[in-house]
Design a protein with these regions (language model features):
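Mg2+-dependent endonuclease catalytic cores in nucleic-acid-processing enzymes, primarily RNase H-like
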Residues: 51-183, 228-233
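Short, flexible hinge/linker loops that cap or flank conserved catalytic cores
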Residues: 24-27, 41, 86, 199
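ATPase catalytic-site recognition across NTP-hydrolyzing enzymes
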Residues: 1-35, 49
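Acidic two-metal-ion nuclease catalytic site recognized across multiple nuclease folds
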Residues: 6, 12, 17, 60, ...
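Acidic active-site catalytic centers that drive phospho-/nucleotidyl reactions
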Residues: 36, 95, 201-204
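Residue-level signal for short segments within beta-strands and strand-turn junctions
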Residues: 49-51, 209
Length: 233
């Protein structure tokens, strides 16, 4: 299906091809949205939905209109509740680095106004340190750590990917090396974009949708507004 890989790519192509969705998605017990916000006008903003570890690409919007992205998230949350009769918490995991912060802020405003109930907003800042002490001994940065979560899920057949050629190409193209301290280090988004000619926006949205492995399925008593203590292990 795809050309032969280099030896230093992080996601084995055979593993990705074996993880493609071919069946209908059943009713979900757990649902997350991964939101990768475009950094530049030529990039895509992508929303990936993860229901019971079955992942779909729900919205791909070219460019960086932040308020349209907020609207897309609100509509997707509404659709999940209506289409799947979903009554549990929806976790919206956003790349909060740079422009993504504007999406996070507006969604939290809507929550404070009572217009986005049953939703927890989880910002992920990719310039921050790896949040897990044990993982920080193995992974150079939070990008490498986040991608490792998806890779581990795919290896254990705990996640199913959509049949999307561009997504698989992005996932199978990202390279890695070892830092001087022996930690796994994925190439930067900028370096990958320069090398392959596009930003791995679909891949990053899928990675974000799987970051919920580090989220407790609870909310703060008496409130559906998530805090750091309510969603991080």
């Amino acid at each position: 299906m795809f050309p032969k890989q280099d030896d230093d790519v992080y996601m084995p192509l055979e593993m990705l091809e074996a993880s493609i969705i071919l069946e209908e998605i059943p009713p979900a017990d757990i649902c997350t949205l991964g939101v990768d916000v475009a950094r530049f006008a030529e990039d895509d903003t992508v929303i990936a939905r993860n229901m019971n570890k079955k992942i779909t690409l729900e919205k791909i919007r070219h460019g960086q209109d932040l308020m349209k992205t907020v609207g897309d998230v609100v509509v997707e949350c509404r659709n999940i509740k209506e289409k799947f009769k979903y009554k549990k918490t929806i976790y919206v995991i956003i790349d909060d680095t740079g422009l993504g912060g504007g999406v996070t802020d507006r969604l939290n405003e809507l929550k404070s106004e009572g217009k986005l109930s049953g939703v927890v907003i989880v910002p992920v800042n990719f310039s921050a340190a790896v949040p897990d002490k044990k993982a920080a001994e193995k992974y150079h940065d939070i990008t490498s750590y986040a991608w490792s979560i998806l890779r581990d899920m795919l290896e254990e057949k705990e996640a199913v990917l959509p049949n999307d050629t561009e997504l698989i190409a992005q996932l199978s193209a990202r390279k890695y090396d070892l830092s001087s301290s022996g930690k796994i280090r994925l190439e930067s988004k900028k370096a990958m974009k320069e090398r392959i000619g596009e930003s791995p926006d679909r891949a990053d949205a899928v990675v974000l949708s799987c970051y919920r492995n580090k989220i407790k399925p609870i909310s703060v008593p008496g409130s559906d507004v998530g805090t750091k203590d309510s969603y991080w292990r």
